[in-house]
């Protein structure tokens, strides 16, 4: 694990990703391969967050480019059928939290923060598709 280096948002994002990974591991395997792909993406995002913290620790005086305020979270991201897939639903909650923390993190961390955000978006899409598949929507 990377040094803290005053990176509370990155640390919080990593913790949320770890919880998402655990929820996906608990989920049943009948998701048409989407669960497995989501696990891969979550683990890649965890690696990117860790690398971002390492980058920040190695470049403590680097400010990076100016960033505007974080993009607002979507108000309604209803996932139809999630109530029938509680572990997958929990993974979505944790992925949204990781995304929120990363959006609020300062600076770009050598590009790793943006990379992690992209991976999280892909993971959310895979989890949604896994829920749809498991609920009969092939």
Give the location of each predicted region.
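Long, charged/polar, soluble alpha-helical segments
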Residues: 2-138
């Amino acid at each position: 694990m990377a040094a803290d280096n005053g990176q509370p948002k990155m640390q919080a994002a990593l913790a949320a990703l770890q919880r998402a990974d655990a929820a996906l591991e608990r989920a049943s395997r009948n998701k048409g391969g989407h669960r497995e792909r989501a696990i891969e993406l979550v683990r890649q995002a965890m690696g990117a967050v860790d690398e971002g913290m390492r980058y920040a620790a190695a470049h403590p005086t680097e400010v990076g480019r100016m960033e505007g305020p974080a993009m607002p979270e979507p108000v309604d991201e209803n996932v139809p059928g999630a109530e029938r897939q509680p572990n997958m639903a929990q993974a979505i909650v944790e992925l949204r939290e990781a995304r929120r923390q990363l959006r609020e993190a300062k600076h770009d961390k050598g590009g790793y923060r943006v990379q992690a955000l992209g991976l999280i978006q892909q993971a959310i899409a895979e989890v949604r598709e896994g829920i749809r598949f498991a609920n009969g929507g092939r």
